[in-house]
UniProtKB/Swiss-Prot annotation:
Promotes colloidosmotic lysis by binding to the midgut epithelial cells of insects. Active on various scarabaeid beetles such as Anomala cuprea, A.rufocuprea and Popillia japonica. One of its GO terms (molecular function) is toxin activity. CDD domains: delta_endotoxin_C. The lineage of its organism: Bacteria, Bacillati, Bacillota, Bacilli, Bacillales. One of its GO terms (biological process) is sporulation resulting in formation of a cellular spore. Belongs to the delta endotoxin family. InterPro entries: Cry1Ac-like_dom-VII, Cry_V, Galactose-bd-like_sf, Pest_crys, Pest_crys_dom-III, Pest_crys_dom_I, Pest_crys_N_sf, Pest_cryst_cen_dom_sf. The keyword Glycoprotein does not apply. This is Pesticidal crystal protein Cry8Ca. Keywords: Sporulation, Toxin, Virulence. It comes from the Bacteria.
Length: 1160
């Protein structure tokens, strides 16, 4: 036979009796099983999962006798996947019953010994006899306890109303749980943690599954809710403990096998593969045992990729001619790291579409030759995504195509060529077994004797048949083996496999929780740094996002007609060292409208910490409509991680169908918890931490309850929340909390720019909107609102707290003022609701939908380190402490809200000022010290205040001729009024330092004297015949050239005549033939004279002249005391009189011009 005549040796298809692909039938219940299970009743279902149906599941007894520990591990994982969650209809599948049959089969095969023996071989470490004996003995006890419990559970299921059956199953549950928990120490004995690891993982699984049952049946067995809650808390704790133990000792065993040579890598990879199957796959399913998080039937998928041995491993020694590839001599073998780098790193999940195989040829002497598989080009595709090629090996020679398409390769049989003599090496032929019951064989000519072995992939990853298998081929890589002289001896392929539970599509079920691992997304884009990392806790890779940029992850999913009309909650399992928010959006090809929801997530770990079980948490949306319409059943989901520096790990996305009745029950439970959380245990008082906003939110929850399903519960909850509202209002020391009247007699005082809002989407009660500060000319006038808590309402040495809620704000200052000011500044984003606000059918506020968004975002906020003291938190509360109470002083506490900037604003409501409690300990001592310091300071303030007050009062008293302040004393001049005014203005502490709009301690005294001074000014203006003679109204009433102006010097208005050609005049009316006194206070600066001339209609004239000689020093002075007052008598003959003022050179400053009628 010629080696070049290969036409007759093309790929041979071995067709099955039927070539129809049935992708819905897979390894036991590791897929959707749509066709198989759709019409199955629960009895058939239980029979199938308990292995009575040979078509769908193996018989545990026959399996154990034929296969090894890996096969048992595969069957156990598949059995668990089949029974996750709680079906909507029918009984809960007893995973426990099936596992008992697998772990303690009827043929008495000791599976636990097989587990231990296998790990001994993998890591070359024997388990001490005493350690093994203790473990086996405790396993026997565990078996008895679990079987007895399972028997009682089945009896109770048949007689659910029997108190005897309930009592028995309750007793046996407690016994089984205790024994399983106690025995776990036997499977983690010191120095044998890794050899016992599969035993530990299986025992842990049994314990957690037993604990799961009390969450499902506990109430029916008679457990009080407190006990059920305690069991749940313990289950969560043990799940974390068991998971961390498994990962820790898996890593320890793997690292122990790390080496440098090719054979060491084979051992390393074999341990990794088999421990994934026996341990880590199980750990990945532990979270699904949580019946509270997974209360529905659940579809789980494992997307990790494992690799079988390089073809031709572990064959040396079976015959004198057969040799493993790594024992070839002389050969330049690949290193440990070279082989490790051949494997595909964690990445997006792909499906194998096609294999193009290339053939190499080797001649050995003149007679022997053979063709062998030299390399391959794989065509891979993402889920609903694009295809791409991967190459490996020698890409030369004849090309053969193995189409895969929508089928799976579940089994491969290789013929390995590994002859010691002449170091012959290769693979030929190879048979691929497909899930449509066909086989395709690659076979090429060869002619030589000896050194051949047939290797079946089923020896490493077991299968039942084309309908029932655990893994599919996902990847192939290969490497050359050369002699030390460089001659190619052959090529060795390595096969990658994924679990068959990972479906070819991302299907969302209408009645099951659908888990879609994150690496089944199709692409990602954005500014964050991202990569996939091995997820030892997760059954597949996790996506790590880091850096400050945002990132969009695109996921295409599919559903059926029933699923298209279903609403879902979307839940993301993640870990993060910083809180943040996901935005979920969906759209289908036939419905371009985008449906979106926000999901807040909290930080679950410290910065750059390693992943553990407990670092993973769930972030969940409210019910949303995915917007699926038309005939299309595929649509796109986008998950956007907001910008912000963080290390975020995403495990999977879950779609939880919303069942109307279930959702109503859940809503009732949430409302009950919210209302109960408002009260103390006695239900007669509020929790001190409860806020008015929380009471309103609880009312919203009650409002959304179904009237048809829960009329009585809703009525009772309404009564409770109304009582809570009454108690909130009773403890609130603020007046007018409904903002009925701003600037009324009692309550709030405010500036312009305050709007009272009713029906705001965030506030059930009335709320306030504060606009930005106003800017007029160069002055900025803040928007403010304040209220004083009267001293009589306060208690000594007590802490009071201000609480409230902010919809959004910018530069909002909130102050509490007593002896000192406490202040916070709030810059709160408007981020609680989506851009399109929820409305009801009438176009009004949809409180039910609004609640979901608000709760999700507040959950994120409440996880912050600073709580509601953070500047961007929506809720706020901060305190102030009192010292001694002084009713005479009536300092009280001032509550202030202020917008000081022109771009500031705020919306706020639910304001409360409440007593928190008396001070004690160090806080009390500190307050007493502060009080003493304050009293000392007040004594000094009072002394200074009294001195300035009495000086000002005496100055004002001297202005008046009577006690009724109706007449000025004769001879009172403007300078007297200005002097008195200066004294009044010198009174300190008139306004509050923190907010000038708030009266200070001397405000009343200051106001009294200011009013009297104003009366003096009014009387003075009446006696001065010249209007605006003091220029307090600028140039009003005066005629002046454009260069003349009035300047404000201290509290005095001064007319400034700057030039010799400047002119100021006024015409006014007097009583003719009466004697007046013209009095002018002025000052001349520089050379020249200043003139004030008065004349009447008869040309009668008097002149007052000012120059620098009027000052005794003769030196130019800017001091106000240098102003000179001059007078002259004037008796006008006419009613009309004129005043003219000018100067010859320099500057002429005039403070006042008076024409006063002399008394007789």
């Amino acid at each position: 036979m010629s080696p070049n005549n290969q036409n007759e040796y093309e790929i041979i298809d071995a067709l099955s009796p039927t070539s129809v692909s049935d992708n819905s039938i897979r390894y036991p219940l590791a897929n959707d099983q749509t066709n198989t299970l759709q019409n199955m009743n629960y009895k058939d279902y239980l029979k199938m999962t308990e292995s009575t149906n040979a078509e769908l599941s193996r018989n545990p007894g026959t399996f154990i006798s034929a296969q090894d520990a890996v096969g048992t591990g595969i069957d156990i994982v598949s059995t668990i996947i089949s029974g996750l969650g709680i079906p909507v209809l029918g009984e809960v599948f007893s995973i426990l019953g099936s596992l008992i049959g697998l772990l303690w089969p009827s043929n008495n095969e000791n599976v636990w010994q097989i587990f231990m023996n296998r790990v001994e071989e993998l890591i070359d470490q024997k388990i001490l006899d005493s350690v093994r004996s203790r473990a086996i003995a405790d396993l026997a006890n565990s078996r008895i306890a679990v079987e007895y419990y399972q028997n009682a559970l089945e009896d109770w299921r048949k007689n659910p109303h029997s108190t005897r059956s309930a009592a028995l199953v309750k007793e046996r549950f407690g016994n089984a749980e205790a024994i399983l928990r106690t025995n776990m120490g036997s499977f983690s004995q010191t120095n044998y943690e890794t050899p016992l690891l599969p035993t530990y993982a299986q025992a842990a699984s049994l314990h957690l599954l037993v604990m799961r049952d009390v969450q499902i049946y506990g109430k029916e067995w008679g457990y009080p809710q407190n006990d059920i809650d305690l069991f749940y808390k313990e289950q969560v704790s043990y799940t974390a403990r068991y998971s961390d133990h498994c990962v820790q000792w898996y890593n320890a065993g793997l690292n122990k096998l790390r080496g440098t040579g090719a054979k060491q890598w084979v051992d390393y990879n074999r341990f990794r593969r088999e421990m994934n199957v026996m341990v880590l796959d199980l750990v990945a399913l532990f979270p699904n045992y949580d019946a509270r998080i997974y209360p529905l039937e659940t579809n789980a998928e494992l997307t990790r990729e494992i690799f079988t041995d390089p073809v031709g491993s572990y064959v040396t020694g079976q015959s004198s001619t057969l040799i493993s590839w790594y024992d070839m001599i002389p050969a330049a073998l690949p290193s440990f790291s070279t082989l490790e780098n051949l494997l595909r790193k964690p990445d997006f999940f792909t499906l194998l579409q096609e294999i193009r195989m290339y053939t190499s040829f080797r001649q050995n002497g003149t007679i022997e030759y053979y063709n062998y598989w030299g390399g391959q080009r794989l065509t891979l595709s993402y889920i609903y995504g694009s295809s791409f090629n991967k190459y490996s090996g020698v890409l030369a020679g004849a090309e053969d195509i193995i189409p895969v398409g929508q089928n799976d390769i579940y089994r491969v049989v290789w013929t390995y060529i590994g002859r010691y003599t002449n170091s012959l090496l290769g693979v030929n032929p190879v048979t691929f077994y497909f899930s449509n019951n066909t086989q395709k064989t690659y076979s090429k000519p060869k002619q030589f004797a000896g050194g051949i072995k047939t290797i079946d992939s089923g020896e490493e990853l077991t299968y039942e048949n084309y309908q029932s298998y655990s893994h599919r081929v996902s990847y192939i890589t290969s490497f050359e083996i050369k002699s030390t002289g460089g001659t190619v001896l052959g090529v060795v392929p390595i096969f990658g496999w994924t679990h068959s539970s990972a479906s070819r599509n991302n299907f969302i079920y209408a009645t099951k929780i659908s888990q879609i691992p994150i690496n089944k997304a199709s692409r990602t884009s954005g500014g964050a740094v991202w990569n996939f990392q091995e997820g030892l806790y997760n059954g597949g890779p996790v996506m790590k996002l880091s850096g400050s940029g945002s990132q969009v992850i695109n996921l295409r999913v599919a559903t059926d007609a029933k699923g298209a009309s279903q609403r879902y909650r979307i839940r993301i399992r993640y870990a993060s060292d910083r809180a943040g928010k996901f935005t979920i959006s969906s759209r289908s090809p036939e419905n371009p409208a985008t449906y979106s929801a926000s999901i807040a997530y909290t930080n679950t770990m410290s910065t750059n910490a390693s992943l553990t079980y407990s670092t993973f948490a769930y972030a969940e949306s409210g019910p949303i409509n995915l917007g699926i319409s038309g005939s299309s059943r595929t649509f796109d989901i986008s998950i956007t991680k907001e910008a912000g520096a963080a290390n975020l790990y995403i495990d999977r996305i879950e779609f939880i169908p919303v069942n109307t009745l279930f959702e109503a029950e859940e809503d009732l439970d949430v409302a009950k918890k919210a209302v109960n959380g408002l009260f103390t245990n006695e239900k007669d008082a509020l929790q001190t931490s409860v806020t008015d906003y929380q009471v309103n939110q609880a009312a919203n929850l009650i409002e959304c309850l179904s009237d048809e399903l829960y009329p009585n519960e809703k009525r009772m909850l309404w009564d409770a929340v109304k009582e809570a509202k009454r108690l909130v209002q009773a403890r609130n020391l603020l007046q007018d909390t409904g903002f009925n009247r701003i600037n009324g007699e009692n309550g709030w005082t405010g500036s312009t720019g305050i709007e009272v809002v009713e029906g705001d989407v965030l506030f059930k009660d009335r709320s306030l909107r504060l606009t930005s500060a106003r800017e007029i000319d160069t002055e900025t006038y803040p928007t403010y609102l304040y209220q004083q808590i009267d001293e009589s309402l306060l208690k000594p040495y007590t802490r009071y707290k201000l609480k409230g809620f902010i919809g959004s704000s910018q530069d909002l200052e909130i102050k509490l003022i007593r002896h000192r000011a406490n202040q916070i500044v709030k810059n709160v984003p408007d981020n609680l609701l989506p851009d399109v606000r929820p409305v009801n059918s009438c176009g009004g506020v949809d409180r039910c939908s609004e609640q979901q968004y608000v709760d999700a975002n507040l959950a994120l906020e409440n996880n912050g380190e600073n709580g509601n003291m953070s500047s961007d938190s929506h809720a706020f509360s901060f305190h102030i402490d009192t010292g001694e109470i002084d009713l005479n002083e009536n300092t009280g506490i001032w509550i202030v809200f202020k917008i000081p900037t022109t771009n500031g604003n705020a919306t706020l409501g639910n304001l409360e000022f409440v007593e928190e409690g008396p001070l004690s300990g160090e806080t009390l001592e500190w307050a007493q010290q502060q009080e003493q310091q304050w009293q000392d300071k007040m004594a000094r303030k009072r002394a200074a205040s009294e001195k300035t007050y009495y000086a000002a009062k005496q100055a004002i008293d001297r202005l008046f001729a009577d006690y009724q302040d109706q007449k000025l004393n004769s001879g009172v001049e403007m300078s007297d009024l200005l002097a008195a005014q200066n004294l009044v203005q010198s009174i300190p502490y008139v306004y509050n330092d923190a907010l000038p709009e708030i009266p200070g301690m001397n405000y009343t005294s200051f106001t009294e004297l200011t009013n009297r001074l104003q009366q003096a000014w009014n009387l003075y203006d009446l006696q001065n015949a010249i209007p605006n003679g003091d220029f307090r109204n600028g140039l009003s009433n005066w005629n002046a050239t454009s260069d003349v102006n009035v300047q404000q010097l201290s509290d005095t208005s001064v007319l400034v005549i700057p030039n010799w050609n400047s002119q100021v005049s006024q015409q006014f009316t007097v009583q003719p033939n009466y004697r007046y006194v013209l009095r002018v206070t002025a000052r001349k600066e520089g050379v020249g004279d200043g003139y004030v001339i008065i004349r009447d209609g008869a040309n009668q004239t008097e002149t007052l002249t000012f120059n620098i000689c009027d000052d005794d020093t003769g030196v130019l002075s800017t001091d106000q005391t240098s102003y000179i007052t001059k007078t002259v008598e004037f008796t006008p003959s006419t009613e009309q009189v004129w005043i003219d003022m000018s100067e010859t050179e320099g500057v002429f400053n005039i403070e006042s011009v008076e024409l006063v009628l002399e008394e007789e």
